[in-house]
Amino acid sequence: MGTFVTPATDYAQFPKANIILITHEHKDHYDLEAITTLRNKATSIFVNNAVFNMFKNGIVMRNGDSIQYAPDIKIEAVPAYNYSEGHQQFHPKGRDNGYILTLDGLRIYIAGDTEDIPEMANLKDIDIAFLPCNQPYTMTVDQLVKAAKTFKPKVVFPYHYGETDIQQVVKLLDGSGIDVRIRDYQ
């Protein structure tokens, strides 16, 4: 028997996007129908090379690239990958992006699908971090906690956590000074 999945969002109810960031080509991150609904002629779509090869549209960003999109908006592509034995094929090193979006000084880290990679030690002054927690595709609870303690964002939103007991993140980061906010981002 298959599993019924309710569509996450009715994107037609949203305003058109100025910017769309796509981390990689997996269907839970690259949804052509959602993109088509949310974009207009002025929308800038930032993608990795694998998405560009499928979509034939967008601005390709590779790990380490940075774009000053507007005077108060900067977009940086950062690495997102799996390193654990047997998991590297899900998100190979060098292919996928996480993003740091700086909006008028507010720094938001969108990790994409990744584990607690060494490059996270280079993240500085992150105000809000969106961190995934769902092995084998992303981080374990312990990896997420280690990552958060490494670069110390002010706020962490765990996402992509499926059946993971995400309250463990709250418990393990209690007293760290990091505000953990749980939403229904399964």
Could you describe each region identified by the protein language model?
Residues 31-39, 166-172:
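Metal-dependent catalytic neighborhoods of phosphoester/phosphodiester hydrolases
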Residues 66-76, 102-108:
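Beta-strand-turn-beta hairpins that frame and shape the catalytic cleft
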Residues 1-25, 32-37, 84-89, 114-122:
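Pre-active-site segment of Zn-dependent metallo-hydrolases
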Residues 45-54, 62-64:
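Short, polar loop motifs at secondary-structure junctions
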Residues 57-73, 93, 145, 149-186:
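Binuclear metal-ion centers of metallo-dependent hydrolases, dominated by the metallo-beta-lactamase
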Residues 15-18, 41, 125, 152:
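Alpha-helix C-terminal capping/helix-to-coil transition sites in glycosyltransferase folds
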Residues 2-3, 17-26, 46-49, 109-112, ...:
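Active-site neighborhood of phospho(di)ester-bond hydrolases with catalytic His/Asp-centered motifs
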Residues 84-149:
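Active-site-proximal loop/helix segments of hydrolase catalytic cores
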